[in-house]
Structure formats: C-alpha cells, structure tokens
Regions:
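Electrostatic cytochrome c docking/interface patches
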Residues: 22-39, 48-56, 96-123, 141
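Inter-heme linker and motif-flanking segments adjacent to c-type heme-binding CXXCH motifs
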Residues: 51-52, 58, 81, 106-117, ...
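Gly/Gly-Pro-rich "capping" loops immediately C-terminal to redox-active cysteine motifs
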Residues: 35, 50-79, 86-91, 127, ...
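Bacterial N-terminal signal peptides
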Residues: 10-22
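The canonical Cys-X-X-Cys-His
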Residues: 42-49, 100, 123-133, 184
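Bacterial N-terminal signal peptides that target proteins for export
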Residues: 1-13
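Extracytoplasmic/secreted proteins, especially bacterial periplasmic and envelope-associated proteins
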Residues: 67, 84-87, 99, 121, ...
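C-terminal capping alpha-helices of c-type cytochrome domains
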Residues: 90-112, 149, 174-191
C-alpha cells in the first residue's frame, strides 16, 4: 500500500469519504450498523465496489476474516509497515476490529480479470499454502485476482526483507527472481 494514499489528506478524510463513497440506503446502513460509519474511510483507498483505484492498494473484499483480522492487528502493533494503515488501524478499538474483518470477509470478491494462458513454473509453490487456484485458506489469503501492482510490491518487500510479518513468504520470495515474481503477479492478477 502506498503510504501517501491518505496521509496527505488525513485531516480531511471524512470529507473525502463523503465525496468518494456513494451514500445509498443499503451501504450506508451496513457501514453505520457495523462501525458507525468508520467503514466509509476504507472505501477511500480500497474502493467502494471492492476494486481499489489507487496503485499499490490491495483488494480486501472477500479476503478471509482471520487474515484481515491478523493484518489489522499487525498494522496496529507496527508489525506491518504502512503509515496510512497504522493511522487508520490504531483508531479501531478491539471491539471494532473483529466486525470490520467480518464485514469485508462477507463482501463479494470483484469479478475476475483476464487470465494469462499458462502459469509460470514458479507458481506451484504458491498452491501449497494459498490453495489450488490460489483462492486462499485458513493459513494464507486469497491471491487469485489480486491487483498486479500490489502483488509485485508485496513480493518485492518480502524478498528484500521489508515486509516481515511472514518469514515463510520472505524465504520463498528471496529465492525467486524479480522477473519471475513479475510473471507470477501477472498470472495471479488474471485469475
């Protein structure tokens, strides 16, 4: 995630959210019921329809609840680096983190992109944790259909030791070349 996504306008986040998040009876009621409107802030970067428009911002709709919960806690503790997400996550109470994770987990993953013709040879290792077709499971999140730019950046950060919240991923990504990681990201984003 780009750390300047919201931080330059953090004080005006409510205004941005109001302008960016279309208020309809359905989604306004859902957001109000779950977190008193705090979910509206998420839509500024992560997209109001589940498809982020900003570079480097991941799709979070439809991810596993336990994965979202883990990531929010890691942002709160500073175990996962992002100035923007830390500012947002620390403003969620423990009573709000669970409902936020549950809310996004119940949302429908955005429609698939165009799949590449064949997977790169390095893809086989991913299915061990991320499940066949990379739909995710208990131990690892869904990757299929995730944004290309987010995947490339996450893989790079794991490979360079900048993202430290999964030692397993760091080891795997360090063993894969940058060009192979890009090929993997291109394939995964098209699933």
């Amino acid at each position: 995630m780009t750390d300047n996504c919201v931080s330059t306008v953090f004080g005006l986040l409510g205004v941005l959210a109001a302008l960016t998040f279309p208020v309809t009876p359905g989604n306004a009621a859902e957001a109000q019921t779950v977190l008193g409107g705090k979910l509206v802030v998420c839509g500024v970067c992560h997209g109001v329809d589940g498809s982020p428009k900003l570079e480097g911002v991941p799709i979070i709709w439809g991810l596993q609840e336990n994965y979202i919960l883990k990531q929010l806690h890691e942002f709160q503790r500073g175990d996962r680096a992002s100035d923007t997400m830390k500012k947002i996550a620390v403003n969620l109470t423990e009573d709000e983190v669970g409902p936020a994770a549950a809310y996004f987990a119940t949302k429908q993953w955005p429609g698939p992109a165009n799949a590449s013709s064949s997977p790169p040879p390095t893809m086989a290792i991913c299915e061990a944790c991320h499940q066949p077709k990379l739909v995710g499971g208990v131990a690892a999140p869904r990757l299929a259909g995730q944004k290309y730019d987010y995947l490339v950046e996450s893989m790079r950060r794991f490979a360079e030791g900048q993202r430290k919240n999964s030692p397993e991923m760091s080891g795997i990504m360090q063993a894969i070349s940058a060009s192979d990681r890009e090929a993997m990201a291109r394939y995964i984003s098209g699933l």
